[in-house]
Design a protein with these regions (language model features):
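Short proline/glycine-enriched turn/loop motifs at strand-loop junctions of beta-rich domains
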Residues: 16-22, 49
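The feature marks proteins involved in alpha-glucan
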Residues: 1-12, 33-110, 115-120, 131
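Short beta-strand elements bearing conserved aromatic residues within extracellular beta-rich modules
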Residues: 23-25, 54
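Substrate-binding/active-site clefts of carbohydrate-active enzymes
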Residues: 77, 96-103, 112-231
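Predominantly extracellular/luminal cell-surface or secreted proteins
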Residues: 26-28, 59
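Residue-level detector of conserved, well-ordered beta-strand and adjacent loop positions
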Residues: 16, 35, 87, 143, ...
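Active-site-proximal helices and loops of the catalytic beta/alpha 8
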Residues: 28, 41, 182
Length: 231
């Protein structure tokens, strides 16, 4: 559910927020009302363009929320508490010939982007790919890179599944790393966490039944089979 783009004759921006009575979208500082449709959906003809930042305001029947990031954000340039940004999906890939590596042939190196290089970024990892290739490594596994609170973190309390940590270089930095790794015959494997959200920066419960009453040491449990999970 969450957010979806709809293209009919004109593009529209839709968000699923059954917990809200009303909703607005803020695009580069300007508020626009969203129209309620069926099943907890709200829609708006104002659509942010790539590079524009946006956030949502939700009315719970009593008061308006503070600006909230997109629950399905692709990029959080100011961190998990800030506005979301529309990401352009085009990229000048050079790895068209890449065909992957059989599991039985993999020589795997697990690394943490934030500490693997002095820069603590995807570009910093690129600078050490030749070193890894010389070791005989042909696959790297990245500890989780989904957005988390702060600048450095193990990654296991991320809150935005579809985005990439801004301090590591964001989605463009990850694309550059994957492309550079493939050019050296190195596969890239992502370590991901899908059973919980981190304790800071998770606003999804304000939109709808995305979490349950359960809790882990890392944060709220994702609502996979509880009330509202089949909405």
């Amino acid at each position: 559910r969450l957010v979806r783009w709809v293209f009919v004759t004109t593009p529209r921006f839709n968000i699923w927020a059954p917990a809200a009575h009303s909703a607005r979208i803020i695009i580069d500082g300007t508020e626009h009302d969203m129209r309620a449709t069926n099943g907890g959906w709200f829609t708006c003809d104002e659509v942010p363009s790539p590079g524009q930042r946006y956030a949502f305001l939700l009315f719970d029947g009593t008061s308006w929320s503070t600006p909230l990031p997109d629950p399905r954000t692709r990029y959080q340039p100011e961190g998990v508490h800030g506005p979301s940004e529309v990401v352009a999906t085009d990229f000048a890939w050079t790895d068209e010939a890449w065909g992957g590596i059989e599991l039985k042939d993999q020589v795997l190196y697990e690394l943490h982007v934030g500490t693997f290089s002095p820069e603590g970024t995807f570009d910093g990892v690129i600078g050490k790919l030749d070193y890894l290739a010389d070791l005989g490594v042909n696959a790297i596994e990245l500890l989780p890179v989904q957005p988390f609170a702060g600048e450095r973190n193990w990654g296991y309390d991320g809150v935005d599944w579809f985005a990439v940590q801004h301090s590591y270089g964001g989605p463009e930095g990850l694309k550059r790393l994957v492309d550079a790794a493939h050019a050296r015959g190195i596969a890239v494997i992502m370590d991901v966490v899908y059973n919980h959200f981190g304790p800071e920066g998770n606003y999804k419960g304000l939109f709808g039944p995305y979490t349950t009453a359960g809790h882990t040491a890392w944060g709220d449990v994702v609502n996979i089979s509880g009330p509202g999970s089949d909405e």
